[in-house]
Curated annotation (Swiss-Prot):
Keywords: ATP-binding, Glutamine amidotransferase, GMP biosynthesis, Ligase, Nucleotide-binding, Purine biosynthesis. Pfam families: GATase, GMP_synt_C, tRNA_Me_trans. Catalyzes the synthesis of GMP from XMP. The keyword Transmembrane does not apply. The active site is at residues 86, 172, 174. This is GMP synthase [glutamine-hydrolyzing]. Pathway: Purine metabolism; GMP biosynthesis; GMP from XMP (L-Gln route): step 1/1. Residues 9-198 form the Glutamine amidotransferase type-1 domain. It catalyses: XMP + L-glutamine + ATP + H2O = GMP + L-glutamate + AMP + diphosphate + 2 H(+). Its EC number is 6.3.5.2. Residues 199-388 form the GMPS ATP-PPase domain. SUPFAM superfamilies: Adenine nucleotide alpha hydrolases-like (SSF52402), Class I glutamine amidotransferase-like (SSF52317), GMP synthetase C-terminal dimerisation domain (SSF54810). It comes from the Bacteria.
């Protein structure tokens, strides 16, 4: 992303750590903008971005293995502060003349370090708990470096070259398990990199609007509205930037939540005076999905059909060159990068046909979910809309496990409406990050009245999270769960059992498909 000259930037280089997004997350919480980029970024690109500091993430590789990820060593000569985390510290050590070798045993979990008071640990206690996750270790530091922290298992828990402002830590300050991790990162960002911390949603809007206007010019944009928070925020942001040059296409694919379609038209079409075309494509989607049970195939079909519908609608309009989507930072990482395997394709970043005739605009693809909500409030979207439950582009299509039918959709739609109503009545909307029902491809025996039943099972998924990268199941009061279960079984046809998902992410994803 091309940033305005006055925008402070901390550049994070990706070496494949499962925590790399958390690094950018933590820095943004300090009011400093941060982006994650591939480790192969060129020196010229870095100079153009003009970052105040560079962080090298952790990663699963060993620095001494053939083909392991590396960087241009010239990065250390740019005069820009550098912080290497875990693999990033080991790589720094190797590239600057130190030595790294495989440890006798992998160190994973909490550890106690003893830190010296310096720039990185300024104001922090000497003894502190950190989170280790590595199988290699530094055995000799480069010339010019000093040890600033050690632990029972390593003499080099943290190192520094104060003159060149190059630092390394063997642990992960970005994870919550590291006791003073945020403080350490804050010291690097504020004390070492001298960032003031002035990044806000207000200046994000200013920068993004200017970028949109420069790119679009006098041309027209189609915005893909799904009914979810992300696409709604994108639509309002674009409308603020280019006004009537924006046409929103709201595809009613028959996979929406109860009352979703009418709500979108009322709140955004009328409320924001936006040009929204509602397309009834239910039969088209259901025909394509008939007999399909594989979740990846369903996602691809829904993603493709979305774009084909837009293509059909765009052919009725003149001069439309762009398609806007509500892709998030987490969407991109979960679909895999050069350093991370694909967990599952996302509807906004996978499934797009090669012959698509639009250029993509994804104005919030560097934001996390909670940042999108803050952006929505700043744009003037009412709180009750901004805090609506996250809803994936494929809609209920990925909350019906296996083949999708009208009857199954109705079960999910009605049970989900009950869940949302009870959560709202109990005042739990802000306490639970995401909650919804799913319909597993499971039937079981039950007794209702005096009769034996053999009907469907509904699953409830409710999680707590900050940004969607990790989550834990919500500890909902048993009486509330019983109320939800009782209402679903009694009010939704063909359901005789309700179960509650108590797995975290990882190992599970939030959505079931």
């Amino acid at each position: 992303m091309e940033m305005a000259k006055e925008q402070e930037l901390i550049l994070v280089l990706d070496f494949g750590s499962q925590y790399n997004q958390l690094i950018t997350r933590r820095i943004r919480e300090m009011g400093v903008y941060s982006e994650l980029h591939d480790h192969e970024i060129s020196i010229e690109e870095i100079k153009k971005m003009n970052p105040k500091g560079i962080i090298l993430s952790g990663g699963p590789n060993s620095v001494y293995e053939e083909g392991s990820f590396t960087i241009d060593p010239e990065i250390y000569n740019l005069g820009i502060p550098v912080l290497g985390i875990c693999y990033g510290m080991q790589l720094t050590t190797k590239l600057l003349g130190g030595k790294v070798e495989r440890a006798n045993e992998r160190e994973y979990g909490k550890a106690i370090i003893n830190a010296k008071s310096d720039e990185l640990f300024a104001g922090l206690p000497a003894e502190q708990t950190v989170w280790m996750s590595h199988s290699d270790k530094v055995i000799e530091i480069p010339e010019g470096f000093e040890v600033i922290a050690d632990s029972p298992s390593t003499d080099y828990a943290a190192i520094e070259d104060k003159k060149r402002r190059i630092y390394g830590v063997q642990f992960h300050p970005e994870v919550r398990h590291t006791e003073y991790g945020n403080d350490l990162l804050n010291n690097f960002v504020r004390r070492v990199c001298e960032c003031k911390g002035q990044w806000t949603m207000e200046n994000f809007i200013e920068i993004e609007i200017e970028k949109i206007r420069q790119r679009v010019g006098d041309r027209r944009v189609l915005c893909a509205m799904s009914g979810g928070v992300d696409s709604s925020v994108v639509a309002v942001l674009l409308h603020k930037a280019i006004g009537d040059q924006l046409t929103c296409i709201f595809v009613d694919h028959g996979l929406l939540r109860k009352g979703e379609g009418d709500m979108v038209m009322e709140q955004f079409g009328e409320g924001f005076n936006m040009n929204i075309i509602r397309v009834n494509a239910k039969d088209r989607f259901m025909n394509k999905l008939k007999g399909v049970s594989d979740p990846e195939q369903k996602r691809k079909i829904i993603g493709n059909e979305f774009v084909y519908v837009f293509d059909d609608e765009a052919s009725k309009l003149k001069g439309v060159d762009f398609l806007a989507q509500g892709t998030l930072y987490t969407d991109v990482i979960e679909s895999g990068t050069k350093t991370a395997q694909t967990i599952k394709s996302h509807h906004n970043v996978g499934g797009l046909p090669e012959d698509m005739e639009f250029e993509l605009i994804e104005p919030i693809n560097t934001l996390f979910k909670d940042e999108v909500r803050k952006l929505g409030i700043e744009l003037g979207i009412p709180e009750h809309l901004v805090w609506r439950q996250p809803f994936p582009g494929p809609g209920l299509g990925i909350r019906v496990l296996g083949e999708i039918t009208e009857d199954k959709l109705e079960i999910v739609r009605e049970s989900d409406a009950i869940l949302r109503q009870v959560i709202r009545e109990e005042g739990l909307e802000r306490e639970i990050w995401q909650y919804f029902t799913v319909l597993p491809n499971i039937q079981s025996v039950g007794v209702m009245g005096d009769y034996r039943t053999y009907d469907h099972t509904v699953g409830i998924r409710a999680v707590t999270s900050i940004d969607g990268m990790t989550s834990d199941f919500a500890r909902i009061d048993w009486e509330v769960l019983q109320k939800i279960s009782s209402r679903i079984v009694n009010e939704v046809d063909h359901v005789n059992r309700v179960v509650y998902d108590i797995t975290s992410k990882p190992p599970s994803t939030i959505e079931w498909e």
